[in-house]
A protein has these predicted regions:
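N-terminal beta1-alpha1 cap of cysteine-dependent amidohydrolase-like domains
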Residues: 1-77, 83-91, 95-123, 129, ...
Length: 195
């Protein structure tokens, strides 16, 4: 079974765990003893704001997976964390990508991997106020909102990918009728893993 380190908390990130399990993977939480050594991939979930630097422990976890050439998927804050780890910067506050309750659904333009998985114009959900400003070294944008906000990034030579939106909230049991089926994000992530 493909083991994914979900770098979060079980009580806060259950939707991510459910998506990984439904796609065929097993979830390992950071507090599990010896879990890090046995994992085949890393999922960085959404969460709070990033202020200039990543917490040291998070940066070390990312380094461990990147240096071993293992797949890494960042979602929302996780994508922002990857961008910062690779030396990129963030817009600290943008408007138009959050609403008081629930996700905001909007169109996007996709190329490359994002288009291959989701089509060229996928409807996606948003709930964030930080975003990529300058891309990190080796990263390229492959999806954008209508206002130019980067919605997905890939690394040119490493199995590293991030999405600003929330595929865990528009796939499998949480599939939405008003947005693209995001299950391919998780299937692709698990397909990149060699046991």
């Amino acid at each position: 079974m493909k083991k994914i380190l979900l770098y979060g908390e079980e009580k806060l990130h259950g939707n991510y765990a459910s998506a990984i399990r439904t796609a065929g993977g097993a979830v390992v939480w950071p507090e599990e003893p010896h879990g890090l050594q046995d994992c085949h991939g890393l999922l960085l979930p959404g969460g709070g704001d990033i202020h200039d630097r990543l917490p040291l422990c998070e940066a070390q976890v990312i380094a461990r997976f990147v240096e071993r050439g293992l797949p890494v998927l960042g979602i929302c804050r996780g994508m922002q964390a990857l961008n910062v780890w690779f030396g990129g910067t963030l817009h600290c506050h943008i408007s138009g990508h959050q609403q008081p309750r629930g996700d905001m659904v909007h169109g996007s333009r996709a190329v490359g991997l994002a288009a291959w998985l989701l089509g060229p114009s996928p409807q996606i959900n948003s709930n964030h106020h930080q975003a990529v400003a300058v891309l990190g070294v080796g990263l390229e944008a492959v999806q954008w909102a209508a206002d130019g906000t980067v919605e997905a990034i890939v690394h040119r030579s490493l199995p590293v990918w991030g999405v600003q939106w929330h595929p865990e909230r528009q796939s499998f049991r949480l599939r939405r009728r008003d947005a693209v089926d995001a299950a391919p994000v998780f299937w692709h992530f698990l397909d990149r893993i060699e046991e």
